[in-house]
Amino acid sequence: DSVMPFINHTPNEKGVYVLNRTSNPGGKDLQNLQVTDNEKRFPLYMEVARGIVNYNAGSGSVGAVVGATNIAELKDIAAFYADKSIPLLIPGVGSQGGTATEVLSVLRSVGYPVELARVNSSSSLTHPWKKAPVPEDWLERCEANLRSMIEDTKV
């Protein structure tokens, strides 16, 4: 009843992304809670991943949001999805600390089809000077970060 209304009202050739494991530090408070299934213990985010696979099986239009800031968790989730055609939206690259190079390396290492991944790096592209005053060369910095991101994510 929380995801299906979105899936049911998604037009053809469109999709929805479900939060699987977020990149914010507080995400671990809930998403890393241990759940048990047939005496096996695993983090809640892996149970969410199983749910995403089930939702996608019915519609083919469900992806997962998995942050780039905890590379070990991204690796576990990507390995689980590697043969299931689940698109990944991966925020947390750039200002939050993840790198596109590391993300793509991890995806490739577990056999995840990188063409299904969308690596997001908005803050480091739109205002790479962090919280400092806007520099005179702000446009050049934005362009340089964009070029770097494109280079880092070439398939």
Question: Predicted segments — roles?
Answer:
Residues V3-I7, A49, L74-K75, A100, ...:
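Generic structural signal for well-ordered alpha-helices
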Residues T10-K14, V35-K40, D83-I86, L107-V110, ...:
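Short, low-complexity, polar/charged sequence segments that are solvent-exposed and flexible
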Residues E39-M46, I71, G97, E136-E143, ...:
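Electropositive phosphate-/nucleotide-binding environments in soluble metabolic enzymes
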Residues V103-Y112, L116, L125-V155:
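C-terminal helical cap(s) of enzyme catalytic domains, especially alpha/beta-barrels
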